[in-house]
């Protein structure tokens, strides 16, 4: 970012560095220090320590008022992530989050309210309308069934019920545990008359690059 700005742009160009989540925090802090001409925005979709609190079966929102972010980071061995996120939130030009409930989380756990709340969601026209939607849906179903049948050696037809879940690998926070238990109950339902194809679109390995 710094090199591109120095060698490809001029002082008259307006540039904003948008950082999402704690993983990009160091980049935002570096740009803030090395290229102050670039505006910096940091957006958190949920605090790292908040995710950890919830993921460890602790009640996050019921007792949010009682949590101290720094203390909980130490207890849950989250000091590095929490520190990067907190310092980034406090030092960028503009700190944002995606909902009022997450903003409450930021106030309590990062000791910093968002400068702006940018509500999460999609525009109404995100989903195609009419025949365009029907065509896309039909092609998508056909592709998913084709892949599943080839992988599993099955012959599931077009009346198959397709369900799915996706997101980062947070087993409890993202409801993956609930999704799998629902499939388990469906699998034992003697009244179920059709095939059910379930997709779990979650990264399976994010620790390091694969060889």
Q: Which residues does each predicted region cover?
A:
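Catalytic cores of nucleotide-sugar-dependent glycosyltransferases that transfer UDP/GDP/TDP-activated
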Residues: 1-211
